[in-house]
Structures are given as C-alpha cells and as structure tokens.
Amino acid sequence: MALPTQQSEELRLYQQTLLQDGLKDMLDHNNFIDCVLKIQGKEFPCHRLVLASCSPYFRAMFLSDLEESKKKEIDLEDVDPDVMGKILHYIYTSEIEITEKNVQDIFSVANMFQIPSIFTVCVSFLQKKLCLSNCLAIFRLGLLLDCPRLAVSARDFVCDRFNLIARDSELYELSPDELIAVISSDSLNIEKEEDVFEVVMKWASKEKEKRTKALPVIFESIRFCLIPQDYIKNKVEKHELVKPNKELLKKLQIVKDAQQGKLPSLKKKTSAKASEGKDGEQVVNGELDEEEEALPGILNDTLRFGMFLKDMIFMISDTGAVAYDPSANECFFASLSAQIPKNHVSLATKENQLFVAGGLYYNEESKEEPLSSYFLQFDHLDSDWLGMPPVPSARCLFGLGESENSIYLIGGKELKEGEQMLDSVLCYDRPSFKWGESDPLPYKVYGHTVVSHDNLVYVLGGKGNEKKCLKRVCVYNPKKFEWKDLAPMKTGRSLFGATVHKGKIFIAAGVTDTGLTNTIEAYDIKTNKWEDFTEFPQERSSLSLVSMNGTLYAIGGFATIENESEELVPTELNDIWRFNEEEKKWEGILREIRYASGATFIAARLNILRLTKM
C-alpha cells in the first residue's frame, strides 16, 4: 500500500538528510576519499560519486576517456580556491553564505561546473538585491552567463524604472544588442516614445563613428508609429546622426507612409520554435517553423506599459486607496494597505509623487520627542505605501505644500497636552530624505488649507487666536526665504477645500464663525484679486476640491442633515460633483463611493494595468 504524500515526503527528506550527513562525516574523517581537487596550491579531498551526482561537468569528466577520469588528483584552473571551498561545503551540507561581495564569483563557478542548485540560489539572491545602482550590471551578468531568468528579471526592473535609469551613465555603456533587449520590451515604463528615441541618440553620440553603424538595427526597436509626425519631421529627421544617413531616412519614410495609410508589402517571416532553457525559461532554438507574413519591425505600434497612465481622483483612507476615473465612470483598487493613519493630509507633487502625513507615531528611541506623525509615500510600482522618515513633531490640522525638491508641513496644532497652535514650518528634503525647519509663518494657524503653484506655497484661511476664522492669505517664496501677505479672502473660513484650477486658486465651502457655508471664491494669481464663484449646492465642511484635465470636481465632506429622530447631526458624505462650465452649475456624478469615508482626495496619474477594477 502506498504511503500518504505527506508521510512519503517526510521519509524522503529524512533519508536525504541522513545520506548527506553520512557523506559529510566520511569527508571529515577522510573515509573513501578517491579524488583531490588541486587549486592554486590548495587541496580539497572529496568523493567522485558526490561530485558526479551534483555536477554534470564532473560526471562527464569521470565517465570520459580523458586522462583526468583516471587520476586521483585533478588540477582546476581559473577558479578561486576560497570560492570552490564554499561550493564543496554546500554540496556536502546544503549550507552556503552568499554575500554581495562573493555572489558573482560563486555564480560564475557554479555556472562553470553546472551546479544548478547553487546557480538558482545565486539567481534568487541577485533578484532580491536588484536596485537602481546594480540592475544594469546584473542584467549584463545574466546575459553573460546565459541565464534568461536573471536577465529577464533585471531587464524588467530596468524597464519599470527606465526614466530613472536613463540618467545613469551605465546605460550608455551597453552594447547594441543589450540596448535593443531593453528598448524592444513592451514593459518599458514610459509615457512617450520620444523618450526612447532620445536615449538611443544620446547612446549613439557617446561613440559616434562606431555606434552610428548600429542605428539601422536599433531603429527597428523604436516605435516611431507612436511618435507624432511633427516630432519626426522636426526632431528625428533633423538630428545630426540621422540627417546624413540614407538608410535611416529610408526607414523613417516607411513610417511616414504608414501614418498616411500606405503600408509596405508584407514580408515572409520564418519563426523559430521555443523550448525550455536550463532555468525553465523559454529560449529560441534552431528549429524552423512555417513561414508567416509580418510588417517591418519599425512599424510596431504596440503601446508600451507606461502609456496606460490615466488621470484619476485618488482617494486615500485608513482602509485602502481607491482610484476613480470620471471619464469612464470606473473605480479601481489601488491599495488595501492599512498603514494610512486617520486624520491625515495628502499631497501630489508636480512629478506625480504621492505623500501622506499625519496620525500619531511613538518612537521609543527618541527620548526628547517620542511622539511624531507618520509620513508615507505611495510606490507606484508595487501599489503600496512606503514608510518615510516620520514628521519630527506630532501635529494635526496642518497643511502640506511643495516647491522644487522640498515638501512643507505648515502650522497646525500640537498633538500633546495643551494642543498649542503652531506657526512653525517643517521642510522635508526629498533627495536627502531628511526633515528640517523652514521660515515660520507670520502667525499661528490651524484648520487652514495649503496649495502650491509655480514653486510658491500658498496658505489660506484657517483659525487663529480665539478660534476666529481667518480671511488671511500668505504666500511663501523658498528662493527668497520670505512670507508675503496677499489679498484676503472675502469670507473667513476653516476646514474648506482648495485647489489651483486654470491659473486661479479656488476655495469652497467650509466652517465660518457663524456655521457652515456653501460659498466659493476664486483668486486670480496675476491680479491678486478675489471674485465670487457659483455656490456649491449644499453647505459643507471638509469639502475637497480637485482640478483634473480642465475640470473642477468637488468631493465628500460633512453636512448637517436631519436624522430619523428629526435631529440635525453632522453626516459624512461620499459623493462626487463636477462643475459644468457651459451651464455654470454643479452636477452630481456619483452618489457614493466605497472606501471614501475619512479619505483625502488628490489628482494623480496612475497606470490602470497596475490597478484592480472594482
């Protein structure tokens, strides 16, 4: 009777362990040694049977008619003895210490002697260590050692971060074939194909005479059909390396003809059958399949991965993050992370970096200031939130703004006994990942709103001394390190929505000294004047304003609504409104959206291929 699967596996594992322990014991006591590997003066006693069972290289050697198959002592060249010692230790114990310093050497020797288990361990180690500084080196290593699994992982990492990698000089040291392997990928995370052309020409310009010869082949991997005709005419054809090259101009003419509907005659294309390589990856072999018809590669018009970006309303709450596409009336899950604190503030920078600050964080290591606030950044690649250096002093009811490479956390109330109002401004330097202090506000304020425009940071309204709602508006110029007062708002308010829309700052609803309001004002930045705007249909506090693709949206907030007991109670609403420019009125487009409770709302560009449709 056959044993149950689990019991069978346990017995197998036990027998493997027993066998391996026995072999190691015999090695340690010099029993049945029939082989000695000699490397640079060092000797490694071992067993032929063990080497042959783990390595096709040694198996072939011992089974051949070569002189080495009969000798007890075998000299190995081009091998580091320390590395070989680690590999032999692994063969007998399944234990090996792989570090960033030795992984390449161990990888190369494991590849040389065809030891797949160590090969796989090294590949997994390198995949986990992939980063901006080493991804190209690992990509080239994968190609050098004929390891598709590693090369593809590294290439995908490069493609995901192509715009960042393009700033690295190492990209421009790739060979033509290596460059083609990257830029021919559908997974390239770029919004415009023009970026690929510019990278290729920058690469070619490094060694003009040598690399220009490779351009006709490389051009086949640039998807010129995705590039506007004006750009091809004014930038591509007039480039100094393209203009005198008749072969390149001929290829570009094919593209221009295709854009006008004149496709070339189809060519017969012979495809090769795929088989599995040693890593289980699909590799191409020499078997020819039947012929098929195909257009020239330069006419490839398949969109890249990064071209599926869409402008969306990003809703961030402590239960998850949801993206809403008003143009298609579709909702997507972006993240179900529970890291987001309640009562947070969110910010989208002009580079589409998304940040959240707020909540209460207790740092045991800081004795002077143990309380701080969370600071998180959204990772577009993994659709998750990354913990950043926490806000040094815990506070609430503050505002977030940005200028250049800095994020400003302005005013608010201390999250400690007394809840003191603050005029202090904290500055987060994005390149160094450090918090510091900036020039303080001219006054203490909380419940205000902050917007950013043209590298200036605007602070509007809020509550000041004696909890009075302020009309005051200030702007901060980081280059001059100064605050300046601007024309005051018509109505003092706090807990209101604000956004920059078509060159003006719009503020909507909120709390006044007499209660809730539905009034909206617009500030003309050029003239320093406020004007009234179409009122919102309902008095609310904490209404959010979002400007996206030339349209103004109003979302959520709190209104005073009569309940079943006919009592007026503050009620949170999760609806979305859009302003109709032609009819000059607000229109409701979504009555309620999930995960919007307690959320903040910002405009963000998100890749729909990374999102899950609700």
Curated annotation (Swiss-Prot):
Any one cellular-component term (Gene Ontology): I band
InterPro entries: BACK, BTB-kelch_protein, BTB/POZ_dom, Kelch-typ_b-propeller, Kelch_1, KLHL40_BTB/POZ_dom, SKP1/BTB/POZ_sf
Domain BTB stretches: 33-100
Entry GO MF terms: ubiquitin-like ligase-substrate adaptor activity
Keyword Repeat attached: yes
Subcellular location: Cytoplasm; Cytoplasm, Myofibril, Sarcomere, A band; Cytoplasm, Myofibril, Sarcomere, I band
Kelch repeat copies, ranges: 353-405, 406-455, 456-503, 504-550, 552-606
Matches recorded under SUPFAM superfamilies: Kelch motif (SSF117281), POZ domain (SSF54695)
Keywords, in A-Z order: Cytoplasm, Developmental protein, Kelch repeat, Repeat, Ubl conjugation pathway
Described purpose of this protein according to its UniProt entry: Substrate-specific adapter of a BCR (BTB-CUL3-RBX1) E3 ubiquitin ligase complex that acts as a key regulator of skeletal muscle development.
Subunit and partners: Component of the BCR(KLHL40) E3 ubiquitin ligase complex.
Stored PANTHER family: KELCH PROTEIN, KELCH-LIKE PROTEIN 40
Protein known as: Kelch-like protein 40
Species this chain originates from: Xenopus laevis
